[in-house]
């Protein structure tokens, strides 16, 4: 049995039965073997679409990172790990090739779908934001007193934010005078997001504590939620329908492949 097959057996058993293949309950073994044979055959058929050859280094790195936890749990030598990563990279390339064969949605389909779902195409509320961070090593209270001093200076004059952020902030945004740009929900730590989206325009937050340290946020401007421009919305609708078409085409291809070739793996 080659490395990717051993890896697939191990991953299947651990993900579905929470144990190694050799430790499966005898009552579960038939179901495991049936699932394994099906998966093995599918993977063999899929990778056959992609000839052995050069695989982009970036793809190999991404695959290695995504499989790292599973690979670390197995007893695989470095050459075996490399073979497993290459196998999964070929799977990715094959699925991408299958997806490219899916029919693209025509303009009338996109327009009709967009008209039925216009309420989904909203630009979210955003805040033009600046950020100042003082990280904490040991004396949290001393850092708290420092950021209170910075808060008082900025609260007296917003013009003080840029030079103080450049001089004192431990956030990479210090290089841009604290600028984070337009921020939507879901991009910041929860406590920072809550504080930012409760601020009025041009308001400064009180110091906010997080696991990183103490923060100040300045909401320079507010851009309310609004409908997307029609052209942008149509492009988003097309992208969504195209993605759905690709996924549907991949599923149909797999179903046809399984029904035609019920082969086994050794």
UniProtKB/Swiss-Prot annotation:
Originating species: Klebsiella pneumoniae
Isomerase is among the record's keywords: yes
SUPFAM superfamilies: FKBP-like (SSF54534)
Purpose of the protein: Required for the activation and stabilization of the iron-component (NifH) of nitrogenase. Probable PPIase.
GO molecular function, one term: peptidyl-prolyl cis-trans isomerase activity
Descriptive protein name: Putative peptidyl-prolyl cis-trans isomerase NifM
Catalytic activity: [protein]-peptidylproline (omega=180) = [protein]-peptidylproline (omega=0)
Lineage, opening ranks: Bacteria, Pseudomonadati, Pseudomonadota, Gammaproteobacteria, Enterobacterales
Gene that encodes it: nifM
UniProt EC number: 5.2.1.8
Family membership noted in the UniProt record: Belongs to the PpiC/parvulin rotamase family.
The keyword Cytoplasm is annotated on this UniProt entry: no
A Pfam entry, by short name: Rotamase
Keyword annotations: Isomerase, Nitrogen fixation, Rotamase
InterPro entries per the UniProt record, alphabetical: Nitrogen_fix_NifM (IPR014282), PPIase_dom_sf (IPR046357), PPIase_PpiC (IPR000297), PPIase_PpiC_CS (IPR023058), PrsA_foldase (IPR050245)
GO BP of this protein: nitrogen fixation
PpiC domain span: 124-221
């Amino acid at each position: 049995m080659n490395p990717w097959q051993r890896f697939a057996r191990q991953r299947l058993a651990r993900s579905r039965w929470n144990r190694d293949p050799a430790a499966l309950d005898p009552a579960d073994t038939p179901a495991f073997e049936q699932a394994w044979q099906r998966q093995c055959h599918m993977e063999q058929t899929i990778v056959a679409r992609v000839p052995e050859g050069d695989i982009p280094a970036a793809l190999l790195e991404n695959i290695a990172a995504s499989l790292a936890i599973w690979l670390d749990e197995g007893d695989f030598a470095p050459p075996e790990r490399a073979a497993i990563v290459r196998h999964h990279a070929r799977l990715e390339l094959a699925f991408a090739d299958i997806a490219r064969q899916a029919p693209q949605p025509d303009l009338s389909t996109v327009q009709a779908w967009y008209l039925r779902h216009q309420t989904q195409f909203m630009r979210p509320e955003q805040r033009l934001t600046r950020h100042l961070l003082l990280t904490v090593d040991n004396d949290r209270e001393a850092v708290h007193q420092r950021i209170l001093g910075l808060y008082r200076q900025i609260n007296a004059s917003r013009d003080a934010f840029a030079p103080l952020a450049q001089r004192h902030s431990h956030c990479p945004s210090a290089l841009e005078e604290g600028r984070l740009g337009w921020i939507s929900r879901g991009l910041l730590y929860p406590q920072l997001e809550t504080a930012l989206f409760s601020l009025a325009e041009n308001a400064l937050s009180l110091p906010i504590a997080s696991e990183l340290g103490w923060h100040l946020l300045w909401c320079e401007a507010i851009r309310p939620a609004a409908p997307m421009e029609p052209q942008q919305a149509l492009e988003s609708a097309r992208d969504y329908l195209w993605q759905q078409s690709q996924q549907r085409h991949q599923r149909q291809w797999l179903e046809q492949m399984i029904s035609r070739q019920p082969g086994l793996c050794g």
